[in-house]
Swiss-Prot record:
Region spans: Disordered: 65-97
Keyword Secreted among record annotations: no
Key words of the record: Lipoprotein, Metal-binding, Methylation, Prenylation
UniProt entry tagged with the keyword Nucleotide-binding: no
InterPro entries: HIPP (IPR051863), HMA_dom (IPR006121), HMA_dom_sf (IPR036163)
Residues in coiled coil: none
Protein family (similarity comment): Belongs to the HIPP family.
Free-text function comment from the UniProt entry: Heavy-metal-binding protein.
Residue numbers carrying Cysteine methyl ester: 123
Binding residues annotated for a metal cation, in chain numbering: 14, 17
Species, as recorded: Arabidopsis thaliana
Molecular function GO terms recorded: metal ion binding
This protein's name: Heavy metal-associated isoprenylated plant protein 43
Lipidation (S-farnesyl cysteine): 123
Amino acid sequence: MTVKKVEIKVDINCGKCNSAIMEAVTEIEGVNHISLDEGNSILTVVGTMDPVCVATRLKKIKQKPVIISVGPPPKPPEPPKPPEPEKPKPPPAPEPPKHVCKPPYCNSCDVVSVTTYESGSGCTIL
């Protein structure tokens, strides 16, 4: 059998009626979930039970059930999808080196510096 949602209009006059309805319906085989809207006097039963069986059980406790609707149960809300992890960013381009490489050149073109020390005389005594 398939799971179905049954809505039944019942007479709720007091708290005793409320508990009698809940007890009668919970004894039915195949009932998964029961909710009772006291303001609108609507009993909602979800499960694989027969809706006529639910109405018959309510008649046995002196209720006048009216089946409002029979249909599939509401779909449970989908859990929110976890955020996708961000893709790793590609590494940044390497920075150019701080020193500048000179182009290669021939050894005959090397710059040579010559330093000379000239002092007035070769020997000094003080």
